[in-house]
Swiss-Prot record:
Transmembrane segments: none
UniProt gene name: pgm
Record-given protein name: Phosphoglucomutase
Annotated catalytic residues: S117 (phosphoserine intermediate)
Source species: Entamoeba dispar
Enzyme class (EC, first level): isomerase
Purpose of the protein: This enzyme participates in both the breakdown and synthesis of glucose.
Length: 553
């Protein structure tokens, strides 16, 4: 195959920003705006420090609409910049955690991940996304994404290779391309290969398979018709021995079959209604988002919040072979995540965004980290990992059942944890697609009033109100304006922040976190006073016109 480098003028396109984890835009906007992807991909190559000289790059994605078009453009821009070692997942597939593992195992300089994560997919009403990962396997840090955004705002020229015939990537193997006298190779690989090898280093699959067989474990796994479908069959059916009937929505589709791939109680209702009832035939259930980095854990009679999952993993790490082999050095959580894990061990508190865990993992300060937004992961790779978290829970069930000489369920583990450590009652309100200026005005009002605001929580006085600022203990960098906190004398917290993962307008997220030794109370009653205070101090209805949240998690 032959390629020729072409250059042509362009003008900047507004709104090409990277948010919490990459570019997120409506697919229709990306498709219908001339040079949208060409501009942004060129900006990435112009500005990212790990793309300034040719090295090995990895490209994959969650299978959503426009991913194949984006992959073609990334390859052709890479060729035009002299890159000769390009690795892509067959048919463009590669989950985010799998790509992180592939970057690390193949010693690549960078990875392009085509995903809008938990956002819907499709031509008309779906989103498209693109993010850049670094040589450590983790998301590009703020200093890199800021430079990419600046390049996109000032771009004047598109540089791209034109191919003499279409590039097809539906067969594993090497494709040789001659570009301007250089021979480049596009390696089309099995997107499972490196990730499954990594999982074998983390878990004892033979032991887990024996446990599943011994207790006839009934499991349901929802892949939302996204990329984890191809991984779920390998992991849960081939390696654990579960029947294929355990898998739901396991065939990847460009529009995810119309499903909203956000693994929470609202959008994973099919799984929740099947597994959580006390008379459910299922012992445990899992759901994973579009690109496979988020997880939902439910059991018969039990929903395991991400915050509780992180806390329980922190107490049961000796049941997880990865930590037995590599040691358990510490835990980090994002600031809005509940303080459940704080009652178990000392923690490092970071802003929302997995990239903030990267320095801590690279420096050996932490082994486990998690976010309230259904993300859990370890230092084995540099992305959160839904399947990894699910296998941790299977490992814990196996170990607890071996100790008890009977099948121990999710509900029993959860309640035993609460009985010992107490319970953090926790809820998140999402106000989606609100007017961006109104949301920003509301946040600024609370910042302005932070030092003078007066409120109490059913008689418990306010301890302080601030705008969370993070000081990185590794590189000394400071990240400000990461969420407004109302912290009360009993440790209860109300938190407001604007999400960086939406594609339209703004999403206001309000978090409620209250600790109690009484773990059997009604959650809504426990948090009712906090909700009333939150509406009052934020004036959210006045600013947005919304009386109720779009989603409650």
């Amino acid at each position: 195959m032959q390629a020729t480098v072409k250059r042509y003028p362009t003008t900047p396109i507004s709104g090409q920003t990277m948010g919490t984890s990459g570019l997120r835009k409506r697919a229709s906007e990306v498709e219908n705006t001339p040079n949208y992807l060409e501009n942004f991909v060129n900006a990435m190559f112009n500005a990212a420090s790990n793309l300034q000289k040719p090295g090995k790059i990895i490209i994959g994605g969650d299978g959503r609409y426009l991913n194949l078009k984006a992959l073609d453009i990334i390859i052709r821009v890479a060729l035009s910049r002299g890159f000769t070692d390009i690795v892509v997942g067959k048919s463009g597939f590669m989950s985010t955690p799998a790509e992180s593992a592939t970057i690390i195992r193949r010693k690549a300089e960078a990875g392009f991940i085509m995903t809008a994560s938990h956002n819907p997919a499709g031509k008309d009403h779906g989103d498209f996304g693109l993010k850049l990962n670094m040589s450590n396997g983790g998301p590009a840090p703020l200093e890199v994404t800021s430079k990419i955004e600046e390049s996109a705002r000032n771009i004047k020229e598109i540089v791209i290779a034109e191919l003499n015939k279409p590039l097809t990537i539906d067969t594993i193997g090497d494709i040789e391309i001659e570009c301007e006298g250089k021979k480049a190779i596009v390696h089309v690989i099995d997107p499972l290969e490196d990730y499954i090898a990594y999982l074998h280093e983390c878990f004892d699959f033979e032991k887990l398979k024996q446990f599943v067989s011994k207790y006839h474990l009934k499991v349901q796994v929802d892949g939302f018709n996204a990329v984890t479908g191809i991984y779920n069959k390998k992991v849960f059916c081939e390696l654990l021995g579960l029947p294929e009937s355990s898998l739901k929505n396991a065939i990847p589709m460009p529009d995810f079959g119309g499903k909203h791939p956000d693994p929470n109680l609202t959008y994973a209702a099919e799984l929740v209604h099947a597994v959580i009832p006390e008379d459910s035939p299922y012992d445990i259930g899992f759901a994973f988002d579009g690109d496979g980095d988020r997880n939902l854990i439910v059991g018969r009679g039990a929903f395991v919040s991400p915050s509780d999952s992180l806390a329980i993993l922190s107490t049961k790490y000796n049941d997880i072979p990865f930590f037995v082999k590599n040691g358990f050095k510490g835990v980090a959580r994002s600031m809005p995540t509940s303080a459940a894990v704080d009652h178990v061990t000392s923690i490092t508190e970071t802003p929302t965004g997995w990239k903030f865990f990267g320095n801590l993992m690279d420096s050996g300060k932490i082994s486990l980290c998690g976010e309230e937004s259904f993300g859990t992961g370890c230092c084995g790779i540099r992305e959160k990992d839904g399947i990894w978290a699910a296998l941790c829970w299977v490992s814990i069930l196996a170990a607890e059942s071996e100790r008890a000489q009977r099948l121990v369920g999710v509900k029993e583990i959860l309640e035993n944890h609460w009985a010992k450590y107490g319970r953090n009652y926790y809820q998140r309100y999402d106000f989606d697609e609100v007017d961006k200026k109104a949301a920003e005005d509301m946040m600024q009002m609370m910042r302005d009033n932070a030092k003078t605001v007066k409120c109490d929580l059913n008689g418990v006085p306010l301890k302080f109100c601030d705008d969370f600022e993070y000081h990185d203990s590794v590189d000394g960098s400071v990240t400000s304006k990461q969420g407004i906190r109302f912290v009360f004398e009993d440790g209860s917290r109300i938190i407001f922040r604007l999400s960086g993962t939406g594609s339209v307008g703004a999403t206001i997220r309000v978090y409620f976190d209250k600790y109690s030794k009484d773990y059997k109370a009604d959650q809504n009653k426990m948090l009712a006073d906090m909700v009333t205070v939150a509406y009052a101090v934020s004036q959210i209805t006045k600013f947005t016109g919304r009386e109720k949240p779009s989603v409650v998690t």
